[in-house]
Amino acid sequence: SEAAAIATPTATVTEDSGATGDSSDDGDDGEDSHATRHLLESVALEHYADKLRAAVEHSSQAIEDYGAKHREARGMGATVTAALVMDGQAFVANVGDSRTYLLRDGKIERLTRDHSLVERLVEAGQITPDEVYDHPSRNLIYRSLGAGHAAPEVDIFVEKLRPGDTLLLCSDGLWEMVRDPQLQQIITEHDDLKKACERLISAANDNGGEDNITAVLVRCLEA
């Protein structure tokens, strides 16, 4: 079992005054500055998302390379969910069925989408979300790092953060054992993130603990 807790100040996109060009007296300065700011923000968003995607792809290739050199590790795979918090935004990468949640104003919301058979069944209306937890095929995934997927398709989600927001990154060993209402309750009841992580892992073990359990909590503070 693994647990981690992080608190980070929320940041804002800053603008270099030299990037807006020369000033003029034609009354368009405000509009030009506003447009330039949006352009800078868009470029920054794409940059961070691309860097995060590249890091995940590099990790997948590293797993493939290791498997090629070690016969016992051939076909080895992994899932990943990762968050990069920059400029007041959370950039979340996901491959497989690990998850990232957002807790805001006491309510929990899943940001990621599982690359699993049961997720597709839910989307098709063939099973309910609650039936995922007991479905015999709940561990079948169609995307992973390694396992013959040197360049997996990486989902990237972007969420603008507010002070007080909390991100939970976790493996299926947590969310399959601790359902969303209990995740929400535990995180809400603990201001100390380390204690909240420990309680999440204890709850997963108390509920059966069928798999490895990883939980990471990240809380955004005032800048």
Question: What does each of the following model-derived ranges do?
Answer:
Residues 1-223:
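PP2C/PPM-type serine/threonine phosphatase catalytic domain
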